[in-house]
Amino acid sequence: MFKFTQHNGIVMPLDIANIDTDIIIPKQFLQKVNKLGFGKYLFHNWRFIDENQSQINPNFILNIEKYKKSSILLTRDNFGCGSSREHAVWALLDYGFKVIIAPSFSDIFYNNSFNNKLLLITLPNNQIDKFFNIINQNPGIYFNIDLLKNEIKVEKKIYSFQIDKFRRFCLLNGLDDIDLTLKNIEKIDSYEKKICNFLIKRKKFVS
C-alpha cells in the first residue's frame, strides 16, 4: 500500500499548455488493461522520431540526461485534456512521476490521477512562472513535496499549496476507491441482507 507523505525529486519543466492524453500516451499503445509497462510509451510522439522508438528525439526534454530520472513534472494549463483514458496516468506513474504541478488539470484526468495515487498540485500562474524561472536557472533542481504540511520546499524557500481534504486523506493513508469501499464492508453486507427478500419477490413478480 503506497502512502504519500513526502517526496524529493528532480523537476522536469514542460512549458506547454493543453497537453492532451493522446500526447501523454498515443492510442496505439492502449492494448493492455494492467497498469505496468506503459512508461516506455510516455510522450512517445515527442520522445521518438520514429514509430518503432529506434530514433530518440535529442531535443525533447525527457531525453536530456539531467531530466531522465525526473519524478516531478511542472507544466501549464489544462494538463491531461482530451479523452478519458486512464492509461495516461498509468504511463506517468510507470515512468516514475509522483507529482505534477500545473495551474489547472482536466477534470477526468484529475480524478484518474488521485484514484491511482498520483499527486496533482494546482498553483496560480504567477507561481508556476516563478518555478519555471527557478528551474531554467538551475537545471536538474530537486523540489521537496511535503503533503503532511502542504508545502513545496525549493532550496531554502517554502511555498504552500492547497489540496482537497478528502484527496489528501486518501493519499496520506494509501486508500483508493476499493479500499474505501472495503472499509464499509460490514454496512454493505448488512444492507444487502436487508434488500435480499425484496429482490427475490421482485424477481418472482417480473417472471
UniProtKB/Swiss-Prot annotation:
Recite the UniProt keywords alphabetically.
Amino-acid biosynthesis, Branched-chain amino acid biosynthesis, Leucine biosynthesis, Lyase, Plasmid
Do the record's keywords include ATP-binding? no
Alphabetized GO MF terms = 3-isopropylmalate dehydratase activity
Q: Which GO terms describe its biological process?
A: L-leucine biosynthetic process
Enzyme Commission numbers on file: 4.2.1.33
* Stored Pfam families: Aconitase_C
Q: In which pathway does it act?
A: Amino-acid biosynthesis; L-leucine biosynthesis; L-leucine from 3-methyl-2-oxobutanoate: step 2/4
Q: Which reaction does it catalyse?
A: (2R,3S)-3-isopropylmalate = (2S)-2-isopropylmalate
What is one cellular component GO term in this UniProt entry?
A: 3-isopropylmalate dehydratase complex
Q: Which Gene3D superfamilies match?
A: Aconitase, domain 4
Functional note = Catalyzes the isomerization between 2-isopropylmalate and 3-isopropylmalate, via the formation of 2-isopropylmaleate.
Q: Which family does it belong to?
A: Belongs to the LeuD family. LeuD type 1 subfamily.
Q: Which PANTHER family match?
A: 3-ISOPROPYLMALATE DEHYDRATASE SMALL SUBUNIT, 3-ISOPROPYLMALATE DEHYDRATASE SMALL SUBUNIT 2-RELATED-RELATED
Q: How does it assemble?
A: Heterodimer of LeuC and LeuD.
Could you tell me what this protein is called? 3-isopropylmalate dehydratase small subunit
- Organism this protein belongs to: Buchnera aphidicola subsp. Pterocomma populeum
